[in-house]
Amino acid sequence: MENSEKTEVVLLACGSFNPITNMHLRLFELAKDYMNGTGKYKVIKGIISPVGDAYKKKGLISAYHRVIMAELATKNSKWVEVDTWESLQKEWTETAKVLRHHQEKLEASICDPQQNSPVLEKPGRKRKWAEQKQDISEKKSLEQTKTKGVPKVKLLCGADFLESFGVPNLWKSEDITKILGDYGLICITRAGNDAQKFIYESDVLWKHQNNIHLVNEWITNDISSTKIRRALRRGQSIRYLVPDLVEEYIEKHNLYSSESEERNVGVVLAPLQRNTTEVKA
């Protein structure tokens, strides 16, 4: 299939990235190889979208630091970048809305190829919008974009994210339907995760199974942000588990400790609080 006939895809990964790890970066590479390998798609960009502070997850440090670490991790990437829109929202933003934002941003780029992303300032200062440098090589002319059509945003995640759809009140059923029906999911499965069975046992996932791409991770990697934070609390090395620049940044700012892990303890996770309140209402 010629490139002009392939559907261009933008991979969007939402999450805490607390901190970002080498495994997060591997998800993009695995998904890109798989999607390009189908012969139907061409992955043109990857976007990392750190969640805002209003998510209220236990141990979640400031979005300012999480965004910077993600930017350091992707500094040498030619196709994966960090977007700060979600992290700047005062309230927690549903994943479906984040997907819609990026899809609309792509559509708007047809008329205005120069799209800017907000930048976080240090905690305690007023957040403001500012222009962010863009790689000139990634810009496309108006005519090229019109010819190829608007790229499709698809959500990139791990198997644990997929299985979270089954947690009561964590997701609105209509949001799951919108994510799967309007955008699609690319799920990297780990050893021990039976994602196919989970899809089979869920009516809504089964209905949209053709828009769920399961990618096997043959070279297994069990790195997680939780394990990284645990190692740091215990004074253990995280070398080769996170990008070197991220490790240096964490050490310089002493980001993770027993105290930071207690942040938001006793606070109900934002989606659970919102969805539970709406159910009662």
Swiss-Prot record:
Residues binding ATP: 15-17, 24, 58, 158-160, 226-229
Function: Catalyzes the formation of NAD(+) from nicotinamide mononucleotide (NMN) and ATP. Can also use the deamidated form; nicotinic acid mononucleotide (NaMN) as substrate with the same efficiency. Can use triazofurin monophosphate (TrMP) as substrate. Also catalyzes the reverse reaction, i.e. the pyrophosphorolytic cleavage of NAD(+). For the pyrophosphorolytic activity, prefers NAD(+) and NaAD as substrates and degrades NADH, nicotinic acid adenine dinucleotide phosphate (NHD) and nicotinamide guanine dinucleotide (NGD) less effectively.
Record pathway: Cofactor biosynthesis; NAD(+) biosynthesis; NAD(+) from nicotinamide D-ribonucleotide: step 1/1; Cofactor biosynthesis; NAD(+) biosynthesis; deamido-NAD(+) from nicotinate D-ribonucleotide: step 1/1
Binding site for NAD(+): 15-17, 23, 57, 92, 95, 158, 160, 170-171, 217, 221
Signal sequence residues: none
Quaternary assembly: Homohexamer. Interacts with ADPRT/PARP1.
Known regulation of activity: Activity is strongly inhibited by galotannin. Inhibited by P1-(adenosine-5')-P4-(nicotinic-acid-riboside-5')-tetraphosphate (Nap4AD).
Cofactor(s) this protein cannot do without: Zn(2+); Mg(2+)
GO biological process, one term: negative regulation of DNA-templated transcription
NCBIfam families: nicotinate (nicotinamide) nucleotide adenylyltransferase
Keywords: ATP-binding, Magnesium, NAD, Nucleotide-binding, Nucleotidyltransferase, Nucleus, Phosphoprotein, Pyridine nucleotide biosynthesis, Transferase, Zinc
Residues with the Phosphoserine modification: 117
Positions of beta-nicotinamide D-ribonucleotide binding: 15-16, 55, 57, 92, 95, 170-171
Sequence motif Nuclear localization signal, residues: 123-129
Source species, domain of life: Eukaryota
Location of the region described as Disordered in the Swiss-Prot/TrEMBL record: 113-143
InterPro entries: Cyt_trans-like (IPR004821), Euk_NMN_adenylyltrnsfrase (IPR051182), NadD/NMNAT (IPR005248), NMNAT_euk (IPR045094), Rossmann-like_a/b/a_fold (IPR014729)
Protein name in the entry: Nicotinamide/nicotinic acid mononucleotide adenylyltransferase 1
Location in or out of the cell: Nucleus
